[in-house]
C-alpha cells in the first residue's frame, strides 16, 4: 500500500514540475518583464516615461564593462590550466620512481 502512496506523490511532483516548466517557457517566450499592453512600466503606474538619451549611453558603457569583466575571467582559467600542467609534470616525475630497474642479461662475452 505504501508503494501506491509513493507513486501518487511522484506523479504529483512530476505534474507540478511539468506545469512549472511550461510556465517558465511561456514567460521566456512572452517576456515576463514586458508589460502586456506594450507601455513602459512607469506609464502603467501613472508616471510619464521620460526619454533620456544619456541613459542609453550608460547602458552601452555597462555592457562594455561586463565584456571586460568576462575577459578577465578568461585569464583566470588560463592560470588554473597552467597550474594543472605543472602538477601533471610533477606526477610524471613520481612515475619514474615506480619503474622497475632493468638488469643487464649476462652473456658469454661478459664472462
Curated annotation (Swiss-Prot):
**What keywords are assigned to this protein?**
Nucleus
**Molecular function via GO:** histone binding
The record's listing under Pfam families reads:
Prothymosin
Q: Give the domain of life.
A: Eukaryota
**A GO cellular component entry from the record:** nucleus
Positions with biased composition (Acidic residues)? 43-81, 90-100
Q: Where is this region: Disordered?
A: 1-111
Mainly resides where? nucleus
Q: State the Gene Ontology BP annotations.
A: negative regulation of apoptotic process; positive regulation of transcription by RNA polymerase II
Cellular compartment(s): Nucleus
Q: Where are the transmembrane segments?
A: none
Output the InterPro entries linked to this UniProt entry: Pro/parathymosin
Compositional bias per record (Basic and acidic residues), positions renumbered to this chain? 9-42, 101-111
Please report which protein family the annotation says this sequence is part of: Belongs to the pro/parathymosin family.
Protein's recorded name = Prothymosin alpha-A
**Name of the coding gene:** ptma-a
Amino acid at each position: 500500500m505504501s508503494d501506491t502512496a509513493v507513486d501518487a506523490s511522484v506523479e504529483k511532483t512530476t505534474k507540478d514540475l511539468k506545469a512549472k516548466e511550461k510556465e517558465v517557457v511561456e514567460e521566456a517566450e512572452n517576456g515576463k518583464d514586458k508589460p502586456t499592453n506594450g507601455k513602459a512600466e512607469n506609464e502603467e503606474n501613472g508616471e510619464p516615461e521620460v526619454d533620456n538619451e544619456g541613459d542609453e549611453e550608460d547602458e552601452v558603457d555597462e555592457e562594455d564593462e561586463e565584456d571586460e569583466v568576462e575577459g578577465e575571467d578568461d585569464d583566470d582559467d588560463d592560470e588554473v590550466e597552467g597550474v594543472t600542467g605543472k602538477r601533471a609534470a610533477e606526477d610524471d616525475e613520481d612515475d619514474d620512481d615506480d619503474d622497475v630497474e632493468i638488469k643487464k642479461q649476462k652473456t658469454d662475452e661478459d664472462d
